[in-house]
Amino acid sequence: MFKGSMVAIVTPFKKGKIDEKAFEKLIEWHIKEGTHGIVPCGTTGEASTLDYEEHYKVIEITVKVVNKRIPVIAGTGSNSTDEAIMITKKAEKLGADAALLVTPYYNKPTQEGLYRHYKEIADKTGIPLILYNVPGRTSVNILPQTVARLAEHPRIVGIKEATGDMKQVSELIRLCGDKITVLSGDDFTNLTLLALGGKGAISVTANICPKDMAELFNAWEKGDIEHARKLHYKLEPLNKAMFIETNPIPVKTALAMMGKIKEEFRLPLCEMSQTNKEKLAEVLRSAGLIK
């Protein structure tokens, strides 16, 4: 159910509020371009600066606009287990198909603490759960052995792996087999992860080039490895450009340059430096995304 190019969609703002019209248009554009799933309220969606009502509103809009055409995987993670349960239950009530739960950040739990955190959430909620491992942001790395334990739970169905460590991903897939779906959380490793047995990606770059990203995964699934490889190299400069400053600053700036959203962030995130903005524009022009 959860495979291919799933966009870690941005949250557009306008004068400090969620730009609902721009958001709805973005979702429709993604579906038209072939995106396989929408992931609201993740890192790229600036979930950390949304209040509860805004968080729920973003999920609600996504579910309503998608209207069951493709899966909606709502970001519901927290470093408080009780809070994660609360948000996940709300996402379930709003109609999300699954929940994406980042590892608890700042409080740095042990592997046993991580296991108990996710098991508690799975025991007390009713939708499929996808773990999210991004130690570069959370300072905690959920190890393959811990994921293998969690994969025994019927509601824990996947993991977004954003370590960029293919040795760890390989061990993870070897230990878990088909019990869990492994998704790339690092666009640089999308093709490599597929070769190891992964099934898709929760992608930042898909925000600006949904058609090409979806086509990469479609080509792989059809066995057209050479075409998938060509798309990988075509997308590589864009993947790099999306991280010349902290995500989601570059991707939102790119979407603003493309006329899709306003160039607006919430503090402590702010606009790009002019130097990096010029570099970004050059990459977008080379890719044919802006004139």
UniProtKB/Swiss-Prot annotation:
Active site residues according to the UniProt entry: Y132 (proton donor/acceptor), K160 (schiff-base intermediate with substrate)
InterPro entries per the UniProt record, alphabetical: Aldolase_TIM, DapA, DapA-like, Schiff_base-form_aldolases_AS, Schiff_base-form_aldolases_CS
Pathway(s) annotated for this protein in UniProt: Amino-acid biosynthesis; L-lysine biosynthesis via DAP pathway; (S)-tetrahydrodipicolinate from L-aspartate: step 3/4
A single GO cellular-component term on record: cytosol
Residues holding pyruvate: T44, I202
Subcellular location(s) of the protein: Cytoplasm
Keywords in alphabetical order: Amino-acid biosynthesis, Cytoplasm, Diaminopimelate biosynthesis, Lyase, Lysine biosynthesis, Schiff base
This enzyme's EC code(s): 4.3.3.7
SUPFAM superfamilies in the cross-refs: Aldolase
Enzyme class: lyase
SMART domains: DHDPS
Record-marked site positions (Part of a proton relay during catalysis): T43, Y106
Gene3D superfamilies: Aldolase class I
Pfam families per UniProt: DHDPS
Residue pairs linked by disulfide bridges in the UniProt entry: none
GO molecular function annotation: 4-hydroxy-tetrahydrodipicolinate synthase activity
Keyword match Iron-sulfur: no
Reactions the enzyme catalyzes: L-aspartate 4-semialdehyde + pyruvate = (2S,4S)-4-hydroxy-2,3,4,5-tetrahydrodipicolinate + H2O + H(+)
Listed PANTHER family: 4-HYDROXY-2-OXOGLUTARATE ALDOLASE, MITOCHONDRIAL (PTHR12128:SF66), DIHYDRODIPICOLINATE SYNTHASE (PTHR12128)
NCBIfam families, sorted: dapA
Biological role stated in the UniProt entry: Catalyzes the condensation of (S)-aspartate-beta-semialdehyde [(S)-ASA] and pyruvate to 4-hydroxy-tetrahydrodipicolinate (HTPA).
Family: Belongs to the DapA family.
Subunit structure: Homotetramer; dimer of dimers.
Name assigned to this protein: 4-hydroxy-tetrahydrodipicolinate synthase
